[in-house]
Amino acid sequence: MNQKKDEKVINQAVKMLTISEDEAGQRIDNYLLAKLKGVPKSLIYRILRKGEVRVNKGRIKPEYKLQANDIVRVPPVRVSEKEHAPISTKLNKVSQLEKQILFEDECLLVLNKPSGIAVHGGSGLSFGVIEALRTLRPDARFLELVHRLDRDTSGILLVAKKRSALRSLHEQLREKTVQKDYLALVRGQWQSHCKVVKAPLLKNELSSGERIVRVSEQGKPSETRFSIEERYEYATLVKASPVTGRTHQIRVHTQYAGHPIALDDKYGDKHFDEQMTQLGLTRLFLHAFSIRFEHPKTGETLRINAPLDPEMKKILGALREQKSSN
């Protein structure tokens, strides 16, 4: 088949790849996303669905977990030049990701993720943090997200550079030995006695594909600890420490407590959001500012902090000024 003018061949011919011990344990879709850099997620799923990708000569589903010594057949892949445009040209923020790396060694990378960038491509997004990092680190054999952050939430994001590091960090998350702290600017005066919110959360998917979470007895047990950092006239800066890790947990728990987060398009308060917009806020005020965990290789306790972005600092400064002038 002739190559079209506006097409780029990512994989010239059929490749038979043997899975190493380090590559084992990951899903085939994630493996292909890393191997076929620049190929849209939709195309990866298409070649999996059509059976063009095979493992040990058999068809597999996207969620298939690779085993050591599996033999993966990867077909030739063509994408349009437009689709293959370097990620950094698609969004200026992504080219700034390099400057947002807080810590990096041979095992892991810790990023201060900007607001507005998804951690993964998909859902109508052509790229995410992980795809951008694979572009910034073309020689990295392994780059996988350890956990997730909502697109509009900024702050600390852990990325494993080795399968062994990913396993160790996932185990720490399961054992609840990872301490994660967030800063959230919420409506009104947070009550001093409200130190823990325990409310089960149920995830729903709307017909549009949008995910929405609500408090429900049918939901999963969920717990967030809160402490007051600073009070303002009509808002409070709180520290939120999730004990469980449910989707939108902090956002729904603050709303449930009667204090929604500033500029939360799903769970927020219109009047409060208007006040915040007038001060210059353009994004959800939720930031993962601190994490503590054991280094997967050395066992040393690491504590990493991510500074607030300039916009958040400016908003807090404006709120302090308002408070002192009244």
Curated annotation (Swiss-Prot):
The EC number on file is 5.4.99.24
Q: Which domain of life is it from?
A: Bacteria
Question: Which top EC class is named for this enzyme in its record?
Answer: isomerase
Q: Which residues form the active site?
A: D150
Q: Which Pfam families does the entry link to? A: PseudoU_synth_2 (PF00849), S4 (PF01479)
Q: Does the keyword rRNA processing apply?
A: yes
Keywords from the named record? Isomerase, RNA-binding, rRNA processing
A GO biological process held by the record: enzyme-directed rRNA pseudouridine synthesis
For the S4 RNA-binding domain, which residue ranges apply? 26-98
Which Gene Ontology terms cover its molecular function?
Answer: 23S rRNA pseudouridine(955/2504/2580) synthase activity; RNA binding
- Annotated SUPFAM superfamilies: Alpha-L RNA-binding motif, Pseudouridine synthase
Gene3D superfamilies found in the cross-reference section: Pseudouridine synthase, RNA-binding S4 domain
The catalysed reaction is:
uridine(955/2504/2580) in 23S rRNA = pseudouridine(955/2504/2580) in 23S rRNA
Quote the InterPro entries the UniProt record gives: PsdUridine_synth_cat_dom_sf, PsdUridine_synth_RluA-like_CS, PsdUridine_synth_RluC/D, PsdUridine_synth_RsuA/RluA, RluA_PseudoU_synthase, S4_RNA-bd, S4_RNA-bd_sf
Family classification? Belongs to the pseudouridine synthase RluA family.
Task of the protein: Responsible for synthesis of pseudouridine from uracil at positions 955, 2504 and 2580 in 23S ribosomal RNA.
- Recorded protein name is Ribosomal large subunit pseudouridine synthase C
